[in-house]
């Protein structure tokens, strides 16, 4: 084992994907990082279905090779009954469209990869207590009956749902429970199933070990009978799963809570919740591992900024702002998706709650949850569907080549957080009704400095200026994007350019 430093820069509780992603990123930045994991690896873990974005994250961590395992299942097609009870939608497989992994194996390999980079690991170990101090945190850890004292400037809690007390959880969706089991696959069942029924919905997929998992998501109140009977009832109501009902074996049905929540105080005096200790997703999205790792990448940037400037308020504000954005976007997306289910109009416990859910922070009022409530209840702007056909860039620029362009009067600016060289900075972001979100950068070009002297310049001179520090084709695409969204206009007395309607 490595020599324990006098004080860690960061100490992480939990060796799941969120904690390991943060550890690897921080180690690459040159920080001393320690970790405690309560269980011995390998250990069984559900959550094997990883969304397509996971490839980019593993490549970013230089760990893409860990996903290249012949036993992992890729390019799985799906059959879906959701919007129309009478119609089965066949979703074809896609290259790098998701992957089914063996989490016990992948987590162990990712941990080994982090240790090879310099991670100080205590496993198995249990946190006895944590005490805030002048220089960070003092942790008492039990390892094989031996008490270990740890000092760390920052603590990351990546212990999953058990890292958040019930009283700290703010539900962002109605309560839900998963009831699940495995049946033998024998390569017969090689596609995923998703189906909505009156008391919830079901997901099925082949997983490692020649097994097929059947998982039902329902309201806890509906579990009046034992879980096995309830699962069988739900399966019998389906078209896709009902042929499998005789393969479900008695005594092998399990349950777990899948209620989506956010922690009421995710950054508390440099004790920071990440992954599912901070925010749990509705299983409908099937992006839980990816989102947890993305949050870890964001917190690594925040920690890097904090350790270089402990007096700055930017790291905490940035992390909480990004977390709120993720929570709100996810909650609204899942609510819309549930509303599209054919059974949503049914007066059943599960679907009525999802139609009428209201965020309630009355028992969890903190600065963070008050900001969350404001964003959660904000009316979402509506954007017209953009033209999907390719824009004829050269043709448009040729028509406007000698025209003078001006910044639209609808353009505004606001200070917002941006990342520059792994540090958080305040930048001026561009706001316009046609843009879905404030823009600081467009294709890695900072917009505010570019806008300073644009008024009255011809299209040709703007292209010439941009092409001095970027490829010509890139400069043309940026300019046409701004023109097509009426951020730039040709006639300053008009609200939009004459070539865009």
Pin down the residues of each PLM region.
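Acidic, low-complexity/disordered tracts enriched in E/D and polar residues
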Residues: 370-454, 476, 480, 489-501
């Amino acid at each position: 084992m490595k020599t324990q430093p006098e004080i860690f820069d960061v100490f992480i509780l939990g060796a799941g994907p969120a904690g390991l992603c943060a550890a690897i990123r921080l180690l690459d930045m040159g920080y001393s990082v320690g970790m405690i994991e309560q269980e011995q690896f390998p250990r069984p873990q559900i959550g094997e279905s990883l969304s397509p974005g996971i490839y980019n994250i593993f490549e970013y961590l230089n760990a893409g090779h860990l996903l290249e395992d012949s036993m992992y299942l890729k390019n799985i097609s799906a059959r879906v009954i959701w919007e129309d009870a009478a119609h089965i939608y066949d979703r074809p497989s896609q290259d790098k469209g998701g992957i089914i992994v063996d989490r016990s194996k992948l987590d162990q390999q990712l941990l080994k990869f982090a240790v090879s980079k310099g991670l100080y690991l205590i496993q198995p170990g249990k946190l006895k207590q944590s005490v805030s101090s002048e220089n960070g945190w003092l942790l008492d850890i039990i390892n094989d009956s031996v008490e270990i004292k740890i000092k760390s400037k920052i603590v990351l809690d990546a212990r999953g749902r058990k890292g958040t007390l019930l009283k700290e959880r703010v539900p962002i969706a109605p309560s839900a429970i998963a009831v699940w089991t495995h049946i033998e696959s024998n390569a017969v069942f090689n596609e995923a199933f998703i189906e909505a029924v009156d008391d919830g919905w079901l997901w099925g997929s082949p997983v490692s070990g020649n097994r097929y998992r059947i998982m039902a998501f329902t309201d806890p109140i509906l579990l009046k009978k034992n879980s096995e009977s309830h699962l069988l009832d739900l399966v019998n109501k389906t078209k896709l799963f009902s042929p499998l009902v005789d393969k479900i074996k008695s005594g092998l049905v399990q349950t777990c809570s899948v209620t989506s929540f956010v922690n009421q105080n995710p950054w508390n005096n440099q004790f920071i919740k990440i992954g599912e200790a901070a925010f749990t997703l509705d299983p409908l999205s099937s992006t839980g591992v990816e989102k947890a790792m993305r949050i870890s990448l964001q917190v690594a940037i925040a920690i890097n900024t904090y350790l270089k400037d402990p007096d700055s308020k930017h790291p905490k504000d940035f992390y909480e702002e990004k977390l709120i954005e993720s929570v709100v976007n996810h909650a609204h997306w899942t609510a819309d998706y549930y509303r599209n289910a054919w059974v949503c109009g049914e007066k059943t416990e599960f679907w009525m709650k999802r139609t009428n859910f209201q965020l309630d922070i009355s028992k969890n009022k903190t600065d963070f949850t008050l900001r969350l409530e404001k964003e959660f209840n904000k009316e979402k702007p509506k954007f017209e569907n953009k033209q999907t056909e390719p824009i004829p860039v050269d043709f448009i620029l040729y028509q406007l080549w000698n025209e003078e362009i001006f910044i639209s009067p609808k353009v505004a600016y606001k200070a917002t957080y941006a990342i520059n060289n792994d540090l958080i900075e305040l930048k001026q972001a561009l706001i316009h009704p046609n843009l879905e979100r404030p823009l600081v950068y467009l294709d890695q070009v900072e917009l505010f400095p570019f806008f300073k002297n644009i008024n009255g310049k011809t299209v040709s001179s703007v292209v010439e200026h941009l092409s001095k520090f970027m490829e010509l084709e890139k400069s043309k695409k940026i300019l046409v994007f701004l023109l097509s969204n009426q951020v730039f206009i040709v006639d300053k007395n008009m609200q939009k350019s004459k070539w865009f309607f």
